[in-house]
Amino acid sequence: MPTTFHEIPRERPLTPLLDSANTPDELRRLAEADLETLADELRQYLLYSVGQSGGHFGAGLGVIELTIALHYVFDTPDDRLVWDVGHQAYPHKILTGRRERMGSLRQKDGLAAFPRRSESEYDTFGVGHSSTSISAALGMAIAARLKGEKRKSVAVIGDGALTAGMAFEALNHATDVGANMLVILNDNDMSISKNVGGLSNYLAKIISSRTYASMREGSKKILSRLPGAWEIARKVEEHAKGMLVPGTLFEELGWNYVGPIDGHDLPTLLATLRNMRDLDGPQFLHVVTKKGKGFAPAEADPIGYHAITKLEPVTPSAVPRKPSGPKYSNVFGQWLCDMAAADQRLVGITPAMKEGSDLVAFAERFPERYFDVAIAEQHAVTLAAGMACDGVKPVVAIYSTFLQRAYDQLIHDVAVQNLDVLFAIDRAGLVGEDGPTHAGSFDISYLRCIPGMLVMTPSDENELRRMLTTGYLFDGPAAVRYPRGSGPNAPLDAGLELLEIGKAIVRRQGKGAALLVFGVQLAEALQVGEALNATVVDMRFVKPLDEALLRELAGSHELLVTIEENAVMGGAGSAVSEFLAAQNIIKPLLHLGLPDYYVEHAKPAQMLAECGLDQAGIERAVRERLDQLRA
């Protein structure tokens, strides 16, 4: 069984076996008897490397044995291995030639937090969002068939990701086309129970064997000649298996279900995977793992150890940390509790982001009004629409990048019917080390084009609180988009204050250029305003715009500058351009925002500097444009 560690090593551990297995080809040269020692070394090295870089933690510890077994049994990268989401892919990265670069994980120009096709031939599909692996692996299996190639496609998906409808759509389609593929359910949501032991492992070996498959097909041919005999035999078989394994659903969908087996038992994993590798058609293997396996603190607190920050140096830096305010998600969580206490109609809905969106306190105080729908963004939005139809006031707490998955429901089910649903959109803008798959780069663009939608962008924590109240009481759909991380520590209202809809506020009066800020770049814009004696406006509302103020500013300034942490294309700057054009107002404009490419992972400050959205970048761009206009 795996060795249990109790501390994250600060010094690089000795890993002689791991050092000899830089690639899967080298891994496959090791004796099978050495693999359990390799697993211990890989687990210890993972602890060390994530301690140096920070990153997703518990999921990778839980798939050490499975990762070794997959690369040992399958001929990767010729056999296609697709990881769902990618939180668990760090051991895979270590075993596929990237061990020496793990220290650069999630850093600028370093390894990505998730599998990336551009990073390694072993990363067969880029991921970050959940529940895509089965569809992708199915596509690869069909491509292999069309090209006459004899290779396997393997999808590894977690029990949480399997709750999404997309996963079941793929499961259903795979059996319809008879795909030659293997789906592995990495079930780390339950402990290894009594049925995941010797008997279950033994049964899995039998069921997955070619002998069993041949006998089953032979029996089917013989019994099919007798009226009703095969159907009776099939039901007897399913009943016998059902007493020991929970795979009836997958069998009914047409998959050959095997398991559950202990995902930390390497001999059983190897034997079962070898058997299933040699079977044709859609195969489904259920493995049970423990998140955080082999690291005692993570086993005890898998949620807390889902991801960790890098270890602090033993001798702390003498440079004091800059004080900051509460996280925007914490401000939302407190507002939600305050508004729920004031209005019994309020309900909170989240697609599996209870901790990330800070609904923990709300769920504890108002459990009957809290709904975690799991990874089901489409359902979350239409559920909210149904509630709103009958007088309930839903607040959907969702990350910007995940709301993209429910865009049709947002328009068709909420906006077209003008329903009172508030979208609290967390992680808007750049998100740092998680990279482009998790960035909220497009929400202003895809929200502002929806008729009747109220769209707001706070500049600080108190503005967020006021906008949430304003959106909640708005007659129709409303969205407040706010970033990851902490605010500037603005004083918070004690009560629930409203904003005048569509009303911006001039934060600094100047001349020459007017900086129109949509969001949290207000502090940087004010610094630029001081340097250039420019006007600075906290726009607050993307939709509706403060049209009267825009007319006034266009008439009194040389240049209008829009600043937003959203794609420039179709963003708030575009809204200003469209308004001025409709009013036949010709005015020089400068749009600052996210460029027309995916900004790669780095520290947030590095990403903002790359995009010209830090104080220096904004000032430089405005000076250059003013110089051009005045030349």
From Swiss-Prot:
GO terms for cellular component: cytosol. Pfam families: DXP_synthase_N (PF13292), Transket_pyr (PF02779), Transketolase_C (PF02780). Its EC number is 2.2.1.7. GO terms for molecular function: 1-deoxy-D-xylulose-5-phosphate synthase activity; magnesium ion binding; thiamine pyrophosphate binding. Residues 1-21 are annotated as: Disordered. Mg(2+) binds at residues 159, 188. Pathway: Metabolic intermediate biosynthesis; 1-deoxy-D-xylulose 5-phosphate biosynthesis; 1-deoxy-D-xylulose 5-phosphate from D-glyceraldehyde 3-phosphate and pyruvate: step 1/1. Its cofactor is Mg(2+); thiamine diphosphate. HAMAP family: DXP_synth (MF_00315). PANTHER family: 1-D-DEOXYXYLULOSE 5-PHOSPHATE SYNTHASE-RELATED, 1-DEOXY-D-XYLULOSE-5-PHOSPHATE SYNTHASE, CHLOROPLASTIC. Belongs to the transketolase family. DXPS subfamily. This is 1-deoxy-D-xylulose-5-phosphate synthase. The lineage of its organism: Bacteria, Pseudomonadati, Pseudomonadota, Gammaproteobacteria, Pseudomonadales.
